[in-house]
Swiss-Prot record:
PANTHER family: CYCLIN-U2-1, PTHR15615
Organism encoding this protein: Oryza sativa subsp. japonica
Pfam (any one): Cyclin
Keyword vocabulary terms for this entry: Cell cycle, Cell division, Cyclin
Name of the molecule in the record: Cyclin-P2-1
Length: 217
């Protein structure tokens, strides 16, 4: 099936006819869940011996020894349903997870999925959204304690080396990557409407200010 651009703003929560937020799940949740399930299966086949050092210690903090008692799709959906997490946040959270994999070799597996995903979504939400729920609320949605999540957030930030910026071009590249998952994930389509999307790095706002300044001269 050929990919087509839809007129709706995909990177906003679906809305009903009256403009209120609908309860339907953002399509990115389905695509990301499918992608992560394959990552977990591959990572658990290819798990290497644990490394030593500070980064390895922080990475081990995410290992809980237990696995989620629900599907990844249901788990990810909880954050859009109960914490009003926007689809942009899921894209940025996935970008963070990919950086961890490339940098310190931190990979999502069954034993760390709950903690790692909850923390990645929390940090991405703080970067993307103007207003956020408290850590204690996010912790409840993710099935963790507030103290646990706050500690994991700090470990996550150090693993990321506090490099949280996601530029427009990088954001777009991850959108395209998720779109390619359509052929593997059962026909989902990650429609893009980036002009309407929240711009994660603030570059659009900066460009607008520069344009306004130039026009005034």
């Amino acid at each position: 099936m050929a990919s087509t651009e839809l007129a709706s703003d995909v990177y906003a929560l679906p809305c009903g006819d009256d403009g209120t937020t609908a309860l339907s799940t953002p399509v990115v949740v389905s695509v990301l869940a499918s992608l992560l399930e394959r990552h977990i299966a591959r990572n658990e086949r290819d798990q290497a011996a644990a490394a030593d050092g500070e980064a390895a210690r922080r990475a081990r903090a995410f290992d809980s020894g237990t696995v989620l008692d629900m599907s990844l799709h249901a788990f990810l959906e909880r954050f859009s349903r109960y914490a009003n997490v926007s689809p942009q946040v899921y894209v940025v959270a996935y970008a963070y997870l990919d950086r961890l994999r490339r940098g310190d070799g931190v990979r999502v597996v069954s034993a760390n999925a709950q903690r790692l995903l909850t923390t990645a979504i929390l940090v991405a939400s703080k970067f993307v959204e103007d207003r956020n729920y408290k850590n204690s609320y996010f912790a409840a949605v993710g099935g963790l304690t507030a103290a646990e999540l706050s500690s994991l957030e700090l470990d996550f930030l150090f693993l990321m080396q506090f490099r949280l910026n996601v530029s427009v071009s990088v954001f777009q590249s991850y959108c395209r990557h998720l779109e390619r998952e359509v052929s593997y994930g059962g026909g989902y389509q990650v429609e893009r409407c980036l002009k309407k999307a929240l711009v994660c790095s603030g570059e659009a706002q900066a460009q607008q200010r520069q344009a306004a300044s130039a026009a005034a001269q």
